[in-house]
Amino acid sequence: MGNCSSSLAVRQRNLSSPLLYRSIPGHRGQIHGSSGKPPSQTWRTFLNNHAKQLVSTDFFVVPTVTFRVLYVFVVLAHERRCLLHFNVTSHPSSEWAAQQMVEALPWGNVPRYLLRDRDAIYGESFRTRVRGMGIREVLTAPQSPWQNPYAERLIGSIRRECLDHVIVFNESSLRRLLNLYFTYYLRSRTHLALGKDPPVSRPVQPPELGAVVELPEVGGLHHRYERRAA
């Protein structure tokens, strides 16, 4: 799924708690059932079992130097932590978000599940479009960002590793900056959960290829290391 073939630090006590939400596939009718017992599957188990069939979405805000607020929308595939799509707008809407899903997921290459929060921006237009694509939505509980851990981790990485170190002037400058960062994220930034590989896997280079060289990325905020012949 997508064109991609992080170490996730999460709160253990939260991810091991019983799955209690009606939106989880396969557990309808088990919540508050006749036995009064919660279902046995945990949230972590659901995420692990469906990693190959699951994408998540989220918005985050970025203020500019003139105090204008920009909204960034991301779509992330869980299996390889691969960013499938991002876009920036100053006026998000349900229709706009729905169009982003179409651009992120080409026809015939859609996941089974979409994990998202309950933000009002995901209105009827968004839900209708996603349903029409054959995707089943899984909603997190109110005020529970830990239930969307991969998207939250990605957004945290963007802030810590990029946005906290720069000044955003306008929408164009933010797009350029995010393009640079996401190129680094996909092709160079290693993830412990992927065996210290980036989302787009890199082959191990043997010593005979040459000396290790340092290549600046994201305007010098980060670096990539490769072997190259002298």
Label each region the model flagged:
Residues 1-230:
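Charged DNA-binding/catalytic regions of mobile-element recombinases
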